[in-house]
Amino acid sequence: MKFFLLILLVIFSIFENASSITGFDAIGSISTTTMKCIKEKGYEFFIGRVWRSMGSHDAAGIENIKNAVKAGYKHVDGYFFPCTTSRCSSAKTQVEEAHKELNKAGAKIGTLWMDIERYEWPSDKAKNRRFILELVKEAEKLGFKVGIYSSYYEWDVIAGADWNGGLNRLPLWWPDYDNEKSFKNFKPFGGFKPSIKQYNGDKNGPCGVNMDFNWY
């Protein structure tokens, strides 16, 4: 019986490792050749920046998305870092502009991840909640599959740890730089469940590219 259980554990471990997929996100220009180089090192998905926190599209990030597709990545997504100060356009307008720029460039993405982290957000949580809901509403209206990038600490400061506004139906991209490909240290917030983990960041990766490391 013990031997049988041991065999099951070994099989489960093999299956778990086989189903583990590693990818990356990065900013700055990355050529198709370099994308292929990174892919050959075992990275299977890429998430490129579509929108910058200063309130404009990321032309290099959108080009990276196209280059990742050309390089044959299994999944290619985009992330949206919103502009949140009083000088910024509305959430709706920002998403519309990002959509326009992606279409103009002919760039296709799987999921558009809304980057909700502490950077120039107002202290008014009610206002922040409305802004987040408007981001998601407009993105879904335009046909995007939407996800959320955040952690307990980021979400708590911006919108409140217990709030989700119905957004916990969306996949969560969770940052936690413990260098472990595991969800075991996830601190729950808003009823979300992690789908992807950013397990390390701002490191020198393969092929001379500075990147964040991701896993699911």
Where are these regions (language model features)?
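Catalytic domains of cell-wall/extracellular-matrix polysaccharide-remodeling enzymes
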Residues: 110-187
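Surface-exposed, flexible loop/turn segments at secondary-structure boundaries
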Residues: 54, 84-86, 154-156, 180, ...
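Substrate-binding cleft of extracellular glycoside hydrolase catalytic domains
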Residues: 19-144
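Cleavable N-terminal signal peptides of Sec/SRP-targeted secreted and luminal proteins
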Residues: 2-17
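Functionally critical loop-and-helix segments that line ligand-binding/catalytic clefts
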Residues: 19-28, 163-216
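Flexible, active-site-proximal loop/turn residues at the rims of small-molecule/cofactor binding pockets
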Residues: 10, 52, 202
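Conserved beta-strand termini and adjacent loop/short-helix elements that scaffold enzyme active sites
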Residues: 81, 149-151, 199
